[in-house]
Design a protein with these regions (language model features):
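Interfacial "coupling" helices/loops that link adjacent transmembrane helices in transporter permeases
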Residues: 19, 252-294, 373, 718-761
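Small-residue-rich transmembrane alpha-helices
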Residues: 255-258, 292-324, 337-363, 391-405, ...
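Short cytosolic juxtamembrane segments of multi-pass membrane proteins
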Residues: 363-379, 823-837
C-alpha cells in the first residue's frame, strides 16, 4: 500500500497539470479563507496583548484617589497623607507629542512607594531602580512605541529622543511588558517634561489598603474599573464573526473545486482501481493530496493575513481608542499559538470541505466510476437533502428566536450570532432547490422555443457545478445588504441624536475651580441666552427595587448632570417614560433620574424602579423617571439635574454649553472669555467641530466593517469566476455542437451571459429579504447584547437595488472571460471540440 502511494499521488496530481485552473481555484479558496480569518485573529491577538499589558500595569490593580471638587491634587496633599502613615503613592499623567505629531501617554511614578504587587515595581532590580530614580533618569517604554519616536530597536537602549517642543526624553530602556504608546519615568522627570509644577494627577494605593477615602477625596476601587478587554469584548466578537463568514465563503470555493476535480478524475480513479489500487489506499492518497495542497494554501493565507492585519490595524486601534479609550499597539504582536491556530483552522476547514468529497468517492463502485454522469446522477437527491437541511436550519433559527424572546434584552449575544448563522445556512441550502424549481418552470414555458429551451436545460446541467458559488454569492450579498443597512441606519440615528443633544453653539471646558467665576461673568453677558452647566461624578449602583423584587448589584456607574433648560428639554431624546415626557421632566427637576439605555438593558431597569446609589460618604435612593439613548458610551450612566448632582454627590462642573441669541457675536465672546480667564486654545469648542469629530469617529469605527464586507463580496465573486474558469473547457464542448448547427458564436456568448445573469438575479432576489432579516438581527439582538442600545430598523430601497445590480454585475464579470474566450475561439478549435463529443 505505502510502496505504491507516491506513484498514485503523482498520478492524482497530474490532473492539475492538465487543469491548472482547478488547482488555482482550490488554492485560491484556501488562500482567501485562511487570509481573512488569520488577519482578523492577528488583529484580535495584538489588541488583547495590548490590553493584557495595560491591565498588568496600573488601571485595574490600584485603588485611585482624586479630589472631590475636581481640582488637581498637589504634592503637599500627598506628603500630608504620607505623614499620617497612609500607604499611598503619587502618580502624574499627561501627554507628550513626538516630532511626527504622535501623542504618547507619559506616566510619572514613585516606585519606592508604589505597591510591590504592581507589574512595574516587580520589574525593578536594585541597580535599575537607582538609574530610574536619579538624573538623568530613565524612560521605560514598549518596543511598539519606538516607531513614533523615529528610533530603530537596535539603537533604542540609551537613546534620548527629542520631542516636538524641543525637550529631550531621559535615556530609553525597553520594557516589553508595558502597554503601547506609554512612557514610564520617575515622577520628578515627568514633572519637568509636563511642566506640571506642584500638581499631580492622582494618588493610588494597593487594592483595599484603605477602607475609605481621606477627607476631601473620592475613592475608586480597582475592582470597579472596567478593563479594556471587558469593554471591547463585543467589538472583537463582531470582528471574529465577520472573519468566520469570510472563512466560510472561501470554503465554498474549496468545496466546488474539490467536487469538480473529483468528477473530472472519475476515469482516472477507475483506471487506478482496475490496476489494483484499493479503495482505502485511494482515499488515503486523496487525503494526503488534500493535506499537501492545504498546507500550501494555508501558509500563503496566513502570510497574507498578517499583511492584511498590518493594513487594517491602525484603523482598528483608532476605533478602539475613540470608543473605549483602549490603547492598541500599531505593530503586530503574535504569540506562537496564533500561527498554530491559524494553520489548524485552515486545515480544519479543508477537512470540512473535503470530507463529503472523500466520502462520496469512497462509496462509488468501479462500475459507477466508469459513468461520466455518476456525480450528477445523485444531484436530485442532494437537492432533497438540501431542502431538508434548510428546513432544519430554519427550525433552529426559530427555536433560537423563541429562546431569545424569553431572555432579558441584553443577553444572548452568541445566540444572536447563531440565529443569523442559521438564517444564512437555511437560505444557502434552499438556493439550489429554488434555482432548480425556477429552471423547471422556465423549461416548461420555453418548450416551443428550442434555443431558449436548450439554454434552460443546459443551466440545469450546470447547476451542480455552480450551486456552491451561487450560495457563496448569496451569503456575501445578504451580509453586505444587512451590515450596510445597519450602518446606514446607525448613521442617520447617530446624526439625529447629535442634533438633539448638542443644542448650544459653543461649549466651554475649563479648570473646575474657575467655573463659578466664569458662570457669574456669563450671567451678565447680554449675548448669552442660557447657560447649560454639566457635572460628572462616579458612584456605585448598590440595589434596584422593582415592584417584583429587590436586587443587590454593586455596579460602578457614571453620574452625569445636565441643566434642564428651555433650550435642552424639548430636544433631549427619551425612549421610555412612565407618564409621558412632561411628567418625566417635571420629576427630573424634583430629583428623579434618567438612566441610559445601556444601564437599563444590562440591569433590566424601567421607569418607576428605585435605585440605591452610593459614593464615598454619600448614599441616595432615587426613582427612575425615563430611559434615554446614549450611543457610543460603553458605560452605564445615571442622568440627574446638575443642581441635584452637586447637592447630593458634590460633583464638580465639567463643561458649560452656551446658548446664544441669534444676533450674538460668537467671535467676540470667545475672545473676551479667553482673555478674561486666561483660557487655553482648546477650552472653547463650537458645535460644528464637536459634530465633525464625532462623525469622524463614527466613520472610522466602521472602516474595518466595510473593508471586510467588500473583501467577502470579492471572495464570492472569485468563487463564481473560478468555478466558470475551471469548467471553461467542458463548456466549449457543450456549446460547440450548437455552433456546428449554425448558431453564431456571438449569440452563444450572449446566451451564456444571460444564463449566469439570470441565475444571479434570482440569487439577488433571495438575498434582499435575507439581508433585511440580518439587519433586524443586528439592530434588535446583536447591538443590544453587544453595546446596550437598540437602533431603529431602517430599510433603504437604493441599497436593495444595488444588491440586485451587484449580483448581476458580479455574475456577468465572472462569466465575461470564459464567454470572450469562446467568442474568440477559432472555427478549427470549435470543430475539434465538436469532434470530441
Amino acid at each position: 500500500m505505502f510502496r505504491a502511494m507516491p506513484t498514485v499521488l503523482a498520478t492524482l496530481l497530474s490532473h492539475y497539470r492538465r487543469h491548472p485552473g482547478q488547482l488555482a481555484m482550490l488554492l485560491l479558496g484556501l488562500w482567501v479563507a485562511s487570509a481573512l480569518w488569520s488577519g482578523i485573529q492577528a488583529i484580535n491577538a495584538t489588541a488583547r496583548d495590548s490590553y493584557a499589558r495595560a491591565d498588568a500595569l496600573f488601571a485595574t490593580q490600584l485603588d485611585q484617589f482624586e479630589r472631590r471638587d475636581g481640582a488637581p491634587l498637589t504634592r503637599a496633599e500627598y506628603h500630608a497623607l504620607r505623614q499620617t502613615g497612609l500607604p499611598v503613592s503619587p502618580m502624574l499623567e499627561g501627554e507628550v507629542v513626538t516630532q511626527d505629531g504622535t501623542r504618547l501617554t507619559l506616566i510619572g511614578i514613585d516606585p519606592l512607594t508604589l505597591s510591590s504587587d504592581n507589574a512595574l515595581a516587580q520589574a525593578n532590580t536594585s541597580a535599575s531602580l537607582s538609574d530610574f530614580l536619579t538624573p538623568p533618569w530613565q524612560t521605560r517604554l514598549a518596543p511598539d512605541a519606538l516607531a513614533a519616536l523615529g528610533i530603530e530597536r537596535d539603537n533604542a537602549p540609551g537613546a534620548s529622543p527629542t520631542l516636538a517642543d524641543g525637550k529631550t526624553l531621559p535615556p530609553l530602556v525597553l520594557a516589553p511588558a508595558l502597554p503601547p504608546d506609554t512612557l514610564i519615568m520617575d515622577i520628578a522627570a515627568a514633572a519637568q517634561l509636563l511642566e506640571s509644577g506642584d500638581e499631580i494627577t492622582r494618588i493610588v494605593s494597593a487594592p483595599g489598603a484603605l477602607a475609605k477615602a481621606p477627607a476631601g477625596l473620592t475613592l475608586t476601587r480597582a475592582s470597579n474599573l472596567a478593563t479594556p478587554g471587558q469593554l471591547t469584548e463585543s467589538f472583537h466578537l463582531n470582528l471574529t464573526a465577520l472573519g468566520l463568514l469570510a472563512w466560510v465563503v472561501g470554503l465554498f470555493i474549496v468545496q466546488a473545486a474539490l467536487g469538480l476535480a473529483l468528477e473530472q478524475r472519475l476515469g482516472m480513479l477507475r483506471t487506478l482501481r482496475v490496476l489494483g489500487v484499493s479503495g482505502r489506499s485511494l482515499v488515503v492518497t486523496l487525503s494526503l493530496e488534500l493535506l499537501l495542497l492545504g498546507l500550501i494554501g494555508a501558509l500563503a493565507g496566513i502570510a497574507s493575513g498578517v499583511w492584511l492585519a498590518r493594513l487594517l490595524l491602525p484603523d482598528v486601534a483608532a476605533t478602539l481608542g475613540s470608543l473605549y479609550g483602549a490603547g492598541v499597539g500599531q505593530e503586530l504582536n503574535l504569540p506562537w499559538h496564533y500561527w498554530v491556530g491559524g494553520l489548524a483552522v485552515s486545515l480544519g476547514g479543508l477537512v470540512l470541505a473535503g470530507s463529503g468529497v472523500l466520502w462520496r468517492a469512497a462509496r462509488l463502485n468501479m462500475l459507477e466510476l466508469g459513468q461520466m454522469q455518476a456525480w450528477r446522477s445523485g444531484y436530485r437527491r442532494q437537492l432533497t437533502l438540501m431542502s431538508m437541511g434548510g428546513a432544519l436550519a430554519l427550525s433552529i433559527a426559530l427555536a433560537l428566536y423563541a429562546w431569545l424572546r424569553l431572555q432579558p434584552p441584553g443577553d444572548g449575544l452568541v445566540a444572536g450570532f447563531g440565529l443569523i448563522a442559521a438564517l444564512l445556512l437555511a437560505s444557502a441550502l434552499w438556493l439550489p432547490p429554488l434555482l432548480a424549481l425556477v429552471l423547471k418552470v422556465l423549461a416548461h414555458l420555453a418548450r416551443r422555443r428550442p434555443l431558449i429551451h436548450w439554454a434552460v436545460a443546459d443551466m440545469q446541467l450546470q447547476l451542480p457545478k455552480l450551486s456552491l458559488a451561487m450560495m457563496a454569492l448569496l451569503i456575501a450579498l445578504a451580509t453586505n445588504l444587512g451590515v450596510g443597512s445597519m450602518v446606514g441606519g446607525f448613521r442617520l440615528t447617530f446624526l439625529d441624536w447629535l442634533d438633539q443633544r448638542l443644542v448650544a453653539p459653543l461649549y466651554l471646558n475649563a479648570p473646575a475651580e474657575q467655573y463659578a467665576d466664569i458662570d457669574a461673568w456669563l450671567a451678565d453677558r447680554p449675548e448669552v441666552f442660557e447657560r447649560l452647566l454639566t457635572r460628572r461624578s462616579d458612584a456605585t449602583l448598590q440595589t434596584v427595587s422593582t415592584p417584583e423584587s429587590n436586587r443587590s448589584l454593586g455596579t460602578p456607574i457614571e453620574l452625569y448632570g445636565i441643566t434642564p433648560g428651555v433650550s435642552l428639554t424639548p430636544h433631549w431624546p427619551l425612549l421610555e417614560t412612565q407618564s409621558g415626557r412632561a411628567a418625566a421632566w417635571a420629576a427630573f427637576d424634583h430629583g428623579a433620574v434618567f438612566v441610559n439605555e445601556q444601564l437599563a438593558t444590562a440591569e433590566n431597569l424601567a421607569p418607576g424602579d428605585r435605585l440605591a446609589l452610593s459614593a464615598p460618604g454619600v448614599s441616595e435612593n432615587l426613582i427612575i423617571a425615563a430611559v434615554y439613548p446614549d450611543y457610543g458610551n460603553p458605560s452605564g450612566q445615571v442622568l440627574m439635574a446638575s443642581p441635584q448632582l452637586a447637592a447630593r454627590f458634590n460633583a464638580p462642573p465639567s463643561s458649560i454649553g452656551l446658548v446664544l441669541h441669534d444676533d450674538a457675536d460668537v467671535g467676540a465672546l470667545r475672545a473676551a472669555l479667553t482673555v478674561r480667564f486666561d483660557l487655553g486654545s482648546d477650552a472653547l469648542t463650537d458645535q460644528a467641530e464637536i459634530k465633525r469629530i464625532a462623525t469622524e469617529i463614527f466613520e472610522r469605527t466602521f472602516t474595518i466593517t466595510r473593508a471586510l464586507n467588500a473583501l467577502t463580496l470579492a471572495v464570492a465573486a472569485l468563487a463564481l469566476f473560478a468555478s466558470l474558469l475551471a469548467q471553461a473547457r467542458s463548456r466549449r464542448q457543450q456549446l460547440a455542437p450548437l455552433w456546428a448547427l449554425g448558431v453564431p458564436r456571438s449569440q452563444l456568448a450572449w446566451l451564456n451571459l444571460a444564463q449566469l445573469g439570470g441565475a444571479a438575479f434570482v440569487t439577488g432576489l433571495l438575498a434582499v429579504p435575507l439581508g433585511i432579516a440580518i439587519t433586524w438581527g443586528l439592530v434588535a439582538i446583536i447591538n443590544v447584547a453587544a453595546f446596550g442600545w437598540r437602533l431603529p430598523l431602517y430599510l433603504f430601497p437604493w441599497e436593495m437595488s444595488v444588491t440586485l445590480a451587484t449580483a448581476v454585475v458580479v455574475a456577468l464579470l465572472a462569466a465575461a472571460l470564459p464567454a470572450l474566450r469562446f467568442w474568440r475561439a477559432s472555427p478549427r478549435a470549435l470543430l475539434a471540440e465538436e469532434a470530441n463529443q
